[in-house]
UniProtKB/Swiss-Prot annotation:
Origin species: Methylobacillus flagellatus (strain ATCC 51484 / DSM 6875 / VKM B-1610 / KT)
Record text on subunit structure and interactions: Component of the ClpX-ClpP complex. Forms a hexameric ring that, in the presence of ATP, binds to fourteen ClpP subunits assembled into a disk-like structure with a central cavity, resembling the structure of eukaryotic proteasomes.
GO terms under biological process: cell division; proteolysis involved in protein catabolic process
Keywords: ATP-binding, Chaperone, Metal-binding, Nucleotide-binding, Zinc
Protein name, as recorded: ATP-dependent Clp protease ATP-binding subunit ClpX
Family: Belongs to the ClpX chaperone family.
Length: 421
């Protein structure tokens, strides 16, 4: 017969410390116990990690189709229909490939990284950022002009992976399914398409260093942004499933394409083309071939790692005006909201929008230059705005953008129009 002391010996959960009377079930193992509450907690943690590893799909849980991706891109980026289609298909196929990655099959689908070619301010970066936001995946940008080969002064290519890890709070699983956008990729072209015996640490050397990273390798990244040194444990990051999007303006590439197409026209059946090809640069860039990129200065192996090519066209005046008013985060909407915070309405007349677009075209800055033009034009009224009593509305016309006249001010207690002094 057991004594009372032995019969009342309490057992405790080895994880949370609760007694057997405080929980519904206590599961025994070799010298350890776990309660039903801790089992539920462990299940929740594992389920969350599995969902995150799977979590390339947007928050709805379903990967959007190329048409749905294009429709969302249309809300933020004006025009560039063909480029959007190219990007939507490439991104959809990439993440579809990752969805099926766990299935055993004899056919392995290779990764298709993307090259985006287009003039400054045409929307290359915005497209990549919008895609990452839509798919709810980590996104990081890198500038190719700051990269050098490992061992030289400057950033080495593994710094890109370090930025990606930092973006995910060093969650390796999450980082391994992110998007990396490398801008100014055309600036690391070698000086000629002939191999050189001299060292080119910021051109061909960087292309060579990026090769393995883009194709898929296990990169050793210093923990928590530290510098590499011996006897240090590195974070191992597999880049196989990271989508790389490389973008650049590729100034002069259209001349290489035109020269190639002129050489191709030989014989009676050939299409006759004038020396001065009247086609727009964007239209010419659509005909780009890998050989043109190699002539430009990208090494053949690097071109081969970027099979999906999307070309963007220069934005004309109409497109720039549309960019000012239509997208969800259009500049005019941003300034209207800013003025509304002061209790004042802001109106842009059509002529003012046209003048902003013309100035951006003159500066050859594309959509990127629109904000600086508006900021300069509205500086004086934004300076005075909090100090003007009873102001109801500000009207911006062409003269304000030109700098010839102040904006029209409409006061709450006066129906007539006045101008800022």
């Amino acid at each position: 017969m057991t004594t009372k002391a032995e019969g009342e010996k309490l057992l405790y959960c080895s994880f949370c410390g609760k007694s057997q009377h405080e929980v519904r079930k206590l599961i025994a193992g070799p010298s350890v116990f776990i309660c039903d509450e801790c089992v539920d907690l462990c299940n929740d943690i594992i389920r969350e990690e599995v969902q995150e590893a799977d979590g390339l799909k947007p928050k709805s849980g379903k990967l959007p189709t190329p048409k749905e991706i294009c429709a969302i891109l249309d809300q933020y980026v004006i025009g560039q229909t063909q480029a959007k289609k190219n990007l939507a298909v490439a991104v959809y196929n990439h993440y579809k490939r990752l969805e099926q990655g766990g299935q055993k099959d004899d056919v392995e689908i290779a990764k298709s990284n993307i090259l985006v070619i287009g003039p400054t301010g045409s929307g290359k970066t915005l497209l990549a950022q919008t895609l990452a936001r839509l798919l709810d995946v980590p996104f990081v940008m890198a500038d190719a002009t700051t990269l050098t080969e490992a061992g030289y002064v400057g950033e080495d290519v593994e710094n890109i992976m370090q930025k990606l890890l930092q973006k995910c709070d060093y969650d390796v699983e999450k980082a391994q399914r992110g998007i990396v956008y490398i801008d100014e990729i055309d600036k690391i072209s070698r000086k000629s398409d002939n191999p050189s015996i001299t060292r080119d640490v910021s051109g061909e050397g960087v292309q060579q260093a990026l090769l393995k990273l883009i194709e898929g390798t296990v990169a050793s990244v210093p923990p928590q942004g530290g510098r590499k040194h011996p006897n240090q444990e590195f974070v191992q990051l597999d880049t196989t499933n990271i989508l790389f999007i490389c973008g650049g303006a590729f100034d002069g590439l259209e001349k290489i394409i035109r020269r190639r197409s002129e050489k191709g026209g030989i014989g009676f059946g050939a299409e006759v083309k004038s020396k001065e090809d009247a086609r727009a640069i964007g239209e010419v860039l659509r005909d780009v071939e890998p050989e043109d990129l190699i002539k430009f200065g990208l090494i053949p192996e690097f071109v081969g790692r970027l099979p999906a090519i999307a070309t963007l066209e220069s934005l004309d005046e109409d497109a720039l005006v549309t960019i000012l008013v239509e997208p969800k985060n259009a500049l005019t909407k941003q300034y209207i909201k800013l003025f509304k915070m002061e209790g004042v309405d802001l109106e842009f007349r059509e002529a003012a929008l046209r003048m902003i677009a013309k100035k951006a075209l003159e500066r050859k800055t594309g959509a990127r230059g629109l904000r600086s033009i508006m900021e300069h034009a509205l500086l004086e009224i934004m300076y005075d705005l909090p100090s003007i009593p009873n102001l109801r509305k500000v009207v911006v016309d062409e003269g304000v953008i030109k700098g010839d006249s102040p904006p029209i001010l409409i006061y709450a207690d006066e129906p007539r129009l006045e101008t800022a002094s």
